[in-house]
């Protein structure tokens, strides 16, 4: 009976393992990868919380201080003990002059704008990083595919040579050379697989998925159209990294206004009630009750010139950095457009004049070897050249794609995904 139970348990375990289905791979295009990153990336979520923090600070600014309740009581028990006493109750409130509370709210609202722009810029940078990581993975895969295609041809050649060697038509040395080249290619492909896995790992971190999730890249490495839009004022106003300097200037102006208003401290208004009982020998006991109003105005002797000078310097700093950022954006657009166009031209020339020709030469040497007009060394020399040209073509194609994407983000033409 015990043996039957053990066998049954083993069978159930086997069936459970056999019934497990591997989760389908996550299919990703460049666009879906960006959308996933904007939803899942934890660093981006941390930046977004800065907006809530700024809103919290703004909600606390521009408020009156709490009113103050006062109560006083005194008597002459420890002295003459004639029954004299006094009572005083009051409520006071401080009121700012010159709209200081409104200016505090202005500063708080500007801080919210700055936090929002920081989040938008983080989204822009993350989107660019994701697209570059996606392209990097595609490039690694294209390199591996190029080697795999030549590996298949090399393995077929090795089989042909082995069959010919058995008929004493070629030497065993040539067979070993072909097998050695196949093994070398297999090792390179294994290294490519490691590089591809590392590229996918970086992509997974950016899009915020588990390292255990399988990813299937839905696109292949291809030439990306070059944006034709030109630099304009709208480009600047669409770039959050430039807008932040504009808002920084606005923030300095708001803080200067707040400092000027703060030179006049709050006016304090108090409503009070007093009651007292005193004893005078000729008159006897007398009672008094008073309801009054008082206010106090601090004199504006305190100077905020140092703080104002600081904000004036920060305003000039923001203006200078805004101009520098504008020049940087213009230079980036010019450079990325130049590189994208140049790489597109190089790619076209490379495909027609180099890659296709090297493939034809390799094919001709292969035919010549089969017809005993060329040796194996000539074939593998042409093979090495053709492989190198294919890998160079992959590198050029990847650079064209990267610069086209960089130009798109420099022009602020990225998809306006929901943040």
Predicted regions and their residues:
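Hydrophobic h-region of N-terminal signal peptides that target proteins for export
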Residues: 9-17
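Bacterial Sec-pathway N-terminal export signals of envelope proteins
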Residues: 18-73, 94-95, 103, 169-172, ...
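Acidic, low-complexity, intrinsically disordered peripheral segments
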Residues: 20-23, 392-419
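Periplasmic alpha-helical coiled-coil/stalk elements that build and connect Gram-negative outer-membrane
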Residues: 28, 122-238, 336-343, 385-386, ...
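Small/polar (Gly/Ser/Thr/Ala-rich) solvent-exposed segments
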Residues: 45, 64-84, 94-121, 243, ...
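A short glycine-centered flexible hinge/capping loop motif at secondary-structure junctions
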Residues: 165-169, 368-375, 410
């Amino acid at each position: 009976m015990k043996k039957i139970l053990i066998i049954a348990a083993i069978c159930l375990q086997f069936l459970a393992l056999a019934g497990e289905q591997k989760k389908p791979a996550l299919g990703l295009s460049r666009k879906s990868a960006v959308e996933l990153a904007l939803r899942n990336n934890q660093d981006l979520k941390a930046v977004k919380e800065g907006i809530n923090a700024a809103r919290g600070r703004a909600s606390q600014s521009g408020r009156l201080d709490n009113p103050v309740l006062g109560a006083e009581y005194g008597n002459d028990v420890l002295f003459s003990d004639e029954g004299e006493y006094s009572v005083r109750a009051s409520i006071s409130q401080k009121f700012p002059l010159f709209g200081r509370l409104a200016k505090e709210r202005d500063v708080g609202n500007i801080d919210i704008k700055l936090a929002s722009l920081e989040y938008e810029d983080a989204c822009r940078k993350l989107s660019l990083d994701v697209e570059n990581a996606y392209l990097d993975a595609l490039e690694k895969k294209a390199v591996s595919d190029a080697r795999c295609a030549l590996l298949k041809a090399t393995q077929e050649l090795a089989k042909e040579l082995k069959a010919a060697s058995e008929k004493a038509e070629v030497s065993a040395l040539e067979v070993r050379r072909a097998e050695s080249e196949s093994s070398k290619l297999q090792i390179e492909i294994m290294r490519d697989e490691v590089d591809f896995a590392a590229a996918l790992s970086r992509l997974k971190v950016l899009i915020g998925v588990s390292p255990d999730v399988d990813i299937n890249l839905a696109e292949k490495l291809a030439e990306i159209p070059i944006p034709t839009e030109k630099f304009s004022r709208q480009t600047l106003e669409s770039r959050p990294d430039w807008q932040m300097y504009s808002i920084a200037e606005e923030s300095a102006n708001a803080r200067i206004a707040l400092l000027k208003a703060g030179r006049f401290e709050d006016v304090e208004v108090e409503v009070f009630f007093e009651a007292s009982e005193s004893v005078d020998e000729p008159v006897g006991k007398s009672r008094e009750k008073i309801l009054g109003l008082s206010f106090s105005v601090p004199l504006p002797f305190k100077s905020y010139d140092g703080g104002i000078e600081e904000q004036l310097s920060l305003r000039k700093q923001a203006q200078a950095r805004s101009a520098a950022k504008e020049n940087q954006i213009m230079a980036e657009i010019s450079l990325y457009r130049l590189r994208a166009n140049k790489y597109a031209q190089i790619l076209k020339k490379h495909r027609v004049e180099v890659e296709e020709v090297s493939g034809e030469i390799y094919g001709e040497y292969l035919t010549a070897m089969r017809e005993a007009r060329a040796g194996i060394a000539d074939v593998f020399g042409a093979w090495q050249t053709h492989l190198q040209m294919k890998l160079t073509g992959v590198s050029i194609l990847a650079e064209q794609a990267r610069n086209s994407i960089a130009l798109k983000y420099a022009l602020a033409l990225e998809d306006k995904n929901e943040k």
